[in-house]
């Protein structure tokens, strides 16, 4: 242990930390701190030093796990993307098999308390909205976005097929997606923002305009 402390850039206290916390758990702690910093300072002004301060750890430990700011931001984005993917897929898997039940579960998942927090919404908006963050987002999240869109289009097509609607599934899915993104943005930018329940009711009002026999502002009929 003495030799490790002598040669480690982390210092004695930080060098001992991996013995107390598994590597994956420490990385997750640093990624969560990065989400907090991005939400507070924006994408371009996030630094490894700020992340270290937010986590209460040394800059050397952040560098040990991620080497560069770009790596840290990529890993943070991938973490958020995986969290989002797991959120909506687990909700649809737990829902009933009908098209309306599946559609509700997929859309309502965006407003669950674990996901729909000011910090996470701010981080997403930073990756979307800041010019320096968009290439990183497009490169690392494009495939998952395409899969999400395809699944949403499929559910809209099923609503046509199973319930007698006659809508363009691609355009309908697009409207539902941009409405979700719009209320997320509202919650981050309005001087007096509404909360997740009102945001979900706004989206469900949009869904009800397309599928009035199956949805209302309250959700499934």
Give the predicted meaning of each segment.
Residues 78-84:
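Short, basic, alpha-helical segments at the C-terminal edge of helix-turn-helix-like DNA-binding modules
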């Amino acid at each position: 242990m003495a030799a490790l402390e002598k040669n480690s850039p982390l210092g004695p206290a930080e060098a001992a930390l991996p013995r107390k916390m598994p590597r994956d758990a420490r990385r997750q702690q640093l990624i969560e701190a990065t989400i907090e910093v991005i939400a507070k300072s924006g994408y371009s002004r996030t630094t490894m030093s700020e992340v270290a301060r937010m986590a209460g750890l040394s800059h050397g430990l952040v560098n040990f796990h991620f080497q560069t700011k770009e790596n840290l931001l990529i890993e943070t984005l991938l973490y958020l993307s995986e969290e989002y993917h797991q959120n909506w897929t687990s909700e649809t898997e737990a829902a009933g098999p009908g098209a309306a039940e599946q559609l509700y579960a997929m859309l309502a998942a965006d407003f669950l308390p674990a996901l729909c927090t000011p910090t996470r919404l701010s981080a997403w908006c930073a990756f979307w909205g800041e010019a320096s963050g968009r290439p990183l987002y497009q490169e690392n999240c494009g495939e998952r976005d395409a899969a999400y869109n395809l699944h949403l289009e499929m559910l809209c097509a099923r609503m046509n097929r199973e319930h007698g609607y006659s809508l363009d599934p691609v355009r309908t899915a697009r409207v539902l997606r941009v409405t979700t993104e719009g209320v997320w943005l509202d919650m981050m930018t309005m001087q007096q923002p509404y909360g997740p329940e009102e945001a979900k009711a706004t989206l469900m009002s949009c869904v009800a305009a397309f599928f009035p026999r199956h949805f209302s502002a309250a959700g499934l009929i």
